[in-house]
């Protein structure tokens, strides 16, 4: 079967022929229909410092997908051949304190598909049946293909009460863009998104952001004054940029709450006085809550949330290089690849 493989320890991804995997007793074989390129996949493609210490060459990458059940393991019940599914890409152990305590998204033994084990950029893949998420008929496959990052956005946006609140989102990648839309959809007052990429800031505005700010051209403090704000009640840090995080700390209202998804450089510093003397709450966000986030994000789409606005490109798998080029250049929202 075709698969996108990190063949060499260099920049690039290669379309190769690999064997079709065989599902174990509790696993399901999935025939992939559509997959989406994630920022993580771009890191692996670029072969940056994180990838070099994390990824083993020869890996089939990818973790954002939708497909149909092609084969059931001998112990699997509750699913049918041909059923359309996505899946939680974090495979957890099921027996640690957090898994047994109802917090599997915090499992210290988590294995990520497309990072630690072979992933979804292939014609077929296997997944534990317990990780599957059935996709309702009303949701098109090109949207279901990126439920994984949509879930990251939902986890962040729903971590704190944003109804009637002023929200600052630093980083207008696809997750930040989606989070901006969720915050407005559920009743935030002002949602301000910052970045230095005008293409993606426009997507955030289209998704419903009150104001978008290119911080290389405009002062965030000036925007706050224009909106008659004393500070932000909720911050969602999506950029992984320490300067953006420190700007957020500077602009938070006393008692504000921050959800952090962006991964900061090792050794990145911050002004701890701002956190302490403003009484800020800072909450790390990892993955999606299993499976509360999946329920909520599915119902958001079914209730009219415009997830489609972040989808900018759909390409056949043979044009995968164009998709990675668009991502590298920052000239795309979500890029979906078709395996049909």
Curated annotation (Swiss-Prot):
Cofactor requirements of the protein: Zn(2+)
Principal location listed in the UniProt entry: cytoplasm
Residues reported to bind Zn(2+) 1: 38, 63-64
PROSITE patterns linked: ADH_ZINC
Catalytic activity: L-threonine + NAD(+) = (2S)-2-amino-3-oxobutanoate + NADH + H(+)
GO biological process, one term: L-threonine catabolic process to glycine
GO cellular component, one term: cytoplasm
GO function term, MF aspect, one: zinc ion binding
Active site per database record: 40, 43
Keyword Nucleotide-binding applies: no
Residues annotated for Zn(2+) 2 binding in this entry: 93, 96, 99, 107
Sequence positions that bind NAD(+): 175, 195, 200, 261-263, 285-286
Pathway: Amino-acid degradation; L-threonine degradation via oxydo-reductase pathway; glycine from L-threonine: step 1/2
EC number(s) reported in the record: 1.1.1.103
Subcellular location: Cytoplasm
Site (Important for catalytic activity for the proton relay mechanism but does not participate directly in the coordination of zinc atom): residue numbering on this chain: 148
HAMAP family: Thr_dehydrog
Family: Belongs to the zinc-containing alcohol dehydrogenase family.
Xref: PANTHER family: L-THREONINE 3-DEHYDROGENASE (PTHR43401:SF2)
Function description: Catalyzes the NAD(+)-dependent oxidation of L-threonine to 2-amino-3-ketobutyrate.
Self-association and partners: Homotetramer.
Name the UniProt record assigns to this protein: L-threonine 3-dehydrogenase
Organism whose genome encodes this protein: Xanthomonas axonopodis pv. citri (strain 306)
Source species taxonomy: Bacteria, Pseudomonadati, Pseudomonadota, Gammaproteobacteria, Lysobacterales
Gene that produces this protein: tdh
């Amino acid at each position: 079967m075709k698969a996108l493989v990190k063949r060499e320890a260099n920049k690039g991804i290669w379309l190769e022929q690999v064997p079709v995997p065989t599902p174990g007793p509790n696993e399901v074989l999935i025939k992939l229909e559509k997959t989406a390129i994630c920022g993580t996949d771009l890191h692996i493609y670029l072969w940056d410092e994180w990838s070099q210490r994390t990824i083993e060459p020869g890996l089939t990458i990818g973790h954002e997908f939708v497909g149909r059940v092609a084969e059931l393991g001998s112990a699997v019940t509750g699913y049918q051949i041909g059923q359309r599914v996505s899946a939680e890409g974090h495979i957890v152990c099921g027996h640690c304190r957090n898994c047994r305590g109802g917090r599997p998204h915090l499992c210290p033994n988590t294995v990520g598909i497309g990072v630690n084990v072979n992933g979804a950029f292939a014609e077929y893949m296997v997944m534990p049946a317990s990780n599957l998420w059935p996709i309702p008929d009303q949701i098109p496959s090109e949207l279901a293909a990126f439920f994984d990052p949509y879930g990251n956005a939902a986890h962040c946006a729903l971590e704190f009460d944003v109804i009637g609140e002023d929200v600052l989102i630093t980083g207008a990648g696809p997750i930040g863009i989606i989070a901006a839309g969720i915050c407005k959809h559920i009743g935030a007052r002002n949602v301000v998104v910052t970045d230095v990429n005008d293409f993606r800031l426009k997507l955030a505005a289209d998704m419903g952001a009150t104001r978008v700010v290119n911080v290389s051209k405009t002062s965030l403090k000036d925007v706050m004054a224009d909106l008659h704000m004393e500070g932000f009640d909720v911050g969602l840090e999506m950029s992984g940029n320490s300067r953006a995080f420190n700007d957020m700390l500077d602009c938070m209202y006393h008692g504000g709450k921050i959800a952090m998804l962006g991964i900061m450089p090792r050794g990145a510093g911050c002004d701890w006085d701002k956190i302490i003397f403003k009484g800020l709450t800072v909450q790390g966000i990892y993955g999606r809550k299993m499976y509360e986030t999946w329920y909520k994000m599915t119902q958001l789409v079914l209730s009219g949330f415009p997830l489609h606005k972040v989808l900018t490109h759909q390409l056949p798998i043979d044009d995968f290089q164009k998709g990675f080029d668009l991502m590298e250049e920052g000239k795309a929202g979500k890029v979906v690849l078709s395996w049909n």
